């Protein structure tokens, strides 16, 4: 009888422990989240979608105190703000901290890469899952593995003067960002003027530049189609720019179940974002048409000619990273292999040793 009572008490204790543990892990949680961008802006879309999906998936158990439009974190402050715990999560952009996280912008160096945004998202996610150095450079600043990999559209050109061919670009002054695109422009006789995207409008209006490089949605966001009526699709590079970063201490405090939930919601939000982006670009195209923007596409032959005279940016980047003790060649080789595996063929061979 005493033996049965002992067994009963042990089982009761186990069940009680399991009950308390499950309820503890399901305790409501409120996290601080920020974005340098307005809540309804293009560049905040990945973050906004994640919050909506998390609240649905968690049944309201995980909620957020939200800080939008740079009210708490400005673009150049993102890395430090997340790492130091000013916020628990924030819209993440590697491009604003290239000196601290130089590996995270690797894809910008692969000129004329696959413009399929889903492919680019998939490749970058796979590389972060298989190349430890990519996550380690964020962990160095106390940031957890990225939750979302959100691409923008391919870099194209909008111009105040007619442009259809490579010859039309020669001698033109072009607003360009990031800095590594300056030698690409110079390779065909263009004059690059380093400019952040918000400055494009004023510089075009004043005649400081003739045209600008950027993704179609960004060119539209800064309203260049109001003063520049010639669009040339060149598909120079399709980057996976947008992410969502979490403070590493916050991440470590999560239960295994909560971590799985955050990763699951991150992947789901990525899918929702890609679908949303497709629809957003349709609206951009319609607005371009309504505003009288003339659309042309650079020929494949012109792309090959341009690529042939460009510097080998992937190789240059790989060597620069290796000199810093970072796996530049591993990242370069892997990106090229995954691109080829996805069926993409570059107009020239990149990453030559």
Model-derived regions, located:
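Sec/Tat signal peptide C-region and signal peptidase I cleavage site
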Residues: 20-26
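N-terminal secretory/targeting leader peptides
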Residues: 27-121, 136-353
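Bacterial N-terminal signal peptides that target proteins for export
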Residues: 1-10
């Amino acid at each position: 009888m005493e033996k049965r009572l002992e067994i009963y008490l042990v089982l009761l204790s186990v069940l009680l422990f399991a009950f308390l543990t499950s309820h503890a892990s399901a305790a409501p949680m409120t996290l601080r989240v920020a974005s340098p961008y307005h809540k309804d802006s293009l560049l905040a879309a990945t973050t906004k979608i994640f919050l909506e999906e998390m609240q649905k998936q968690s049944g309201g158990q995980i909620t957020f105190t939200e800080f939008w439009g740079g009210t708490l974190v400005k673009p150049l402050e993102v890395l430090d703000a997340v790492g130091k715990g000013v916020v628990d999560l924030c819209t993440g952009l590697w491009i604003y901290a290239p000196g601290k996280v130089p590996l995270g912008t690797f894809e910008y160096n692969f000129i004329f890469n696959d413009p399929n945004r889903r492919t680019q998202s998939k490749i970058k996610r796979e590389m972060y899952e298989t190349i430890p150095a990519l996550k380690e450079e964020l962990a160095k600043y106390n940031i957890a593995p990225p939750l979302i990999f959100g691409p923008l559209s391919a870099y194209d050109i909008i111009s105040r003067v007619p442009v259809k061919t490579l010859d039309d670009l020669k001698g033109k002054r072009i607003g360009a960002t990031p800095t590594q695109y300056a030698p690409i422009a110079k390779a065909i006789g263009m004059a690059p003027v380093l400019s952040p995207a918000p400055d494009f409008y004023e510089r075009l209006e004043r005649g400081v530049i003739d045209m600008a490089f950027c993704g179609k949605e960004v060119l539209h966001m800064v309203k260049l189609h109001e003063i520049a009526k010639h669009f040339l699709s060149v598909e120079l590079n399709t980057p996976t720019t947008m992410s969502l970063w979490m403070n590493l201490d916050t991440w470590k405090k999560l239960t295994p179940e909560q971590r799985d939930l955050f990763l699951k919601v991150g992947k789901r939000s990525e899918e929702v974002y890609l679908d949303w982006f497709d629809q957003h670009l349709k609206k951009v195209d319609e607005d371009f048409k309504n505003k009288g923007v003339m659309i042309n596409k650079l020929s494949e032959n012109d792309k090959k000619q341009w690529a042939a005279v460009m510097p080998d940016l992937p190789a240059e980047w790989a060597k620069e990273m290796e000199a810093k003790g970072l796996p530049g060649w591993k990242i370069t080789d892997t990106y090229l292999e995954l691109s080829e595996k996805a069926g993409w063929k570059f107009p020239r061979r990149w990453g030559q040793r």
